Swiss-Prot record:
<dbReference type="GO" id="GO:0015935">
    <property type="term" value="C:small ribosomal subunit"/>
</dbReference>
<keyword id="KW-0699">rRNA-binding</keyword>
<comment type="subunit">
    <text>Part of the 30S ribosomal subunit. Contacts proteins S4 and S8.</text>
</comment>
<dbReference type="InterPro" id="IPR000851">
    <property type="entry name" value="Ribosomal_uS5"/>
</dbReference>
<dbReference type="Pfam" id="PF00333">
    <property type="entry name" value="Ribosomal_S5"/>
</dbReference>
<dbReference type="InterPro" id="IPR018192">
    <property type="entry name" value="Ribosomal_uS5_N_CS"/>
</dbReference>
<dbReference type="InterPro" id="IPR013810">
    <property type="entry name" value="Ribosomal_uS5_N"/>
</dbReference>
<feature type="compositionally biased region" description="Basic and acidic residues">
    <location>
        <begin position="13"/>
        <end position="40"/>
    </location>
</feature>
<dbReference type="InterPro" id="IPR005324">
    <property type="entry name" value="Ribosomal_uS5_C"/>
</dbReference>
<keyword id="KW-0689">Ribosomal protein</keyword>
<feature type="domain" description="S5 DRBM">
    <location>
        <begin position="44"/>
        <end position="107"/>
    </location>
</feature>
<keyword id="KW-0694">RNA-binding</keyword>
<dbReference type="GO" id="GO:0006412">
    <property type="term" value="P:translation"/>
</dbReference>
<protein>
    <recommendedName>
        <fullName>Small ribosomal subunit protein uS5</fullName>
    </recommendedName>
</protein>
<dbReference type="InterPro" id="IPR005712">
    <property type="entry name" value="Ribosomal_uS5_bac-type"/>
</dbReference>
<comment type="function">
    <text>Located at the back of the 30S subunit body where it stabilizes the conformation of the head with respect to the body.</text>
</comment>
<dbReference type="InterPro" id="IPR020568">
    <property type="entry name" value="Ribosomal_Su5_D2-typ_SF"/>
</dbReference>
């Protein structure tokens, strides 16, 4: 009887090693939007909005580097914007992420939308944000959408009224979000009851949202 070639076992080993390589080569869930470099950062959403190559003329010629505009948020009202620069793209993104995390700010939300219409401006960028009813979704362009999704906004109408440059749009969107105020803040500033400042529908949605959050916290406490 002729001996079988050793290729059968080798093919199996090749498949096993290929499987190991595939398992090692998989990136964290979310691709560019959810890199999982360590356990802490896996809790945050990351969006790379723009990557540009820049050059600097020196005596010996040109030196090239990369810049990255990154949005980071927890998907629950916290968001930040960072701008990183380095000789390599991954390093530029990492610097942008760190800067964004240092610049976190809170966005007032009620049931997944903003509290009132607002317009933000930055350089030539102008962005108008309007609240939307549940189920509307995020109606916005790519740059503004990245900021809103990382902030945890689920229903909103956004329109760019100025420059289409991604950097200007991002900073205008951030400027608009920073202008948002809670009904309690407006009532306290005017010296009026909150019922005289905020619409009844907003107050009802606020109460329902608080009730859902309290119920979720109670369930988590009971599970522990």
């Amino acid at each position: 009887m002729a001996e079988q070639p050793a290729g059968g076992q080798g093919a199996g080993d090749s498949r096993d090693s290929r499987g190991d390589r595939d398992s090692r080569g998989r990136r964290g869930d979310g691709g560019r939007g959810g890199r999982d470099r360590d356990g802490d950062k896996s809790n945050y959403l990351e969006r790379v909005v723009a990557i540009n190559r820049v050059s600097k003329v020196v005596k010996g010629g040109r030196r090239f580097s990369f810049t990255a505009l990154v949005i980071v948020g927890d998907g629950n009202g916290m968001v930040g914007v960072g701008y990183g620069k380095a000789k390599e793209v991954p390093a530029a993104i990492a610097k942008g992420v760190e800067e964004a995390r240092k610049g976190f700010f809170r966005v007032p939300l009620i049931r997944g939308t903003i509290t009132h219409p607002v317009q933000g401006e930055a350089a030539a960028g102008v962005v108008l944000l309007r609240p939307a009813s549940p189920g509307t979704g995020v109606i916005a362009g790519g740059a503004a959408r990245a900021v809103l999704e990382c902030a945890g906004v689920h229903d909103i109408l956004a329109k760019s009224l100025g420059s289409d440059n991604a950097i200007n749009v991002v900073h205008a969107t951030v400027a608009a979000l920073k202008l948002l105020q809670r009904p309690e803040e407006v009532a306290a500033r005017r010296g009026l009851p909150i019922e005289d400042v905020a619409p009844a529908g907003m107050l009802k949605a606020r109460r329902e949202s608080d009730a859902l959050a309290s119920a979720a916290a109670a369930r988590e406490a009971a599970a522990q």
